[in-house]
């Protein structure tokens, strides 16, 4: 975005030091326990939308989003399309793991490695089981 605004900038991605894996959705334990249908429905809807975008509908999704929700991004449309194509579609939303387990699937081994690394570099005081954080929606 900065480069496209006429300013030269280099990028240091967090993945070089502390990787992230796709989308992160947060729901409290109470909501998950009280209304799992809503949590599951939201996850399924998001995954369906991501699959649709990946399947060649990036420009359509950006145009609809600008029109309905973010009209101030109209002048940045082409940059947003480029970012979605270059980052989200190619690497953030898809991986070998999601190819095998479906869009939106979380790799517990990678999350555990991230938790362990976070302890190692002092971001957290104690490690814990990644399974405590991961939720798999009903099919």
What is each model feature region?
Residues 1-14, 72-79:
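Ligand-binding "clamshell"
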Residues 34-121:
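Secondary-structure end/capping motifs
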Residues 1-5, 17-22, 109:
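Bilobed "Venus flytrap"/periplasmic-binding protein-like clamshell domains
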Residues 22-38:
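A bilobed periplasmic-binding-protein/Venus flytrap-type ligand-binding module shared by bacterial periplasmic
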Residues 113-139:
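Hinge/cleft segment of the Venus flytrap/periplasmic-binding protein
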Residues 16-18, 68-69:
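Glycine-rich beta-alpha junction loops
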């Amino acid at each position: 975005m900065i480069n496209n605004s006429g300013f030269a900038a280099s990028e240091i991605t967090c993945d070089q030091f502390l990787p992230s894996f796709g989308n992160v959705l947060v729901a409290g334990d109470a909501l998950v326990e009280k209304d799992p249908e809503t949590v599951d429905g939201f996850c399924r809807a998001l995954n369906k939308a991501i699959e649709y975008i990946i399947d060649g509908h990036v420009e359509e999704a950006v145009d609809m989003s600008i029109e309905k929700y973010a009209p101030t991004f109209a002048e940045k449309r082409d940059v947003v399309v480029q970012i979605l194509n270059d980052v989200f579609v190619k690497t953030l939303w898809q991986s070998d793991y999601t190819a095998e387990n479906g869009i939106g699937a979380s790799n517990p081994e990678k999350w555990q490695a991230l938790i362990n690394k976070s302890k190692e570099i002092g971001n957290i005081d104690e490690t814990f089981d990644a399974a405590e954080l991961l939720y798999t929606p009903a099919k």
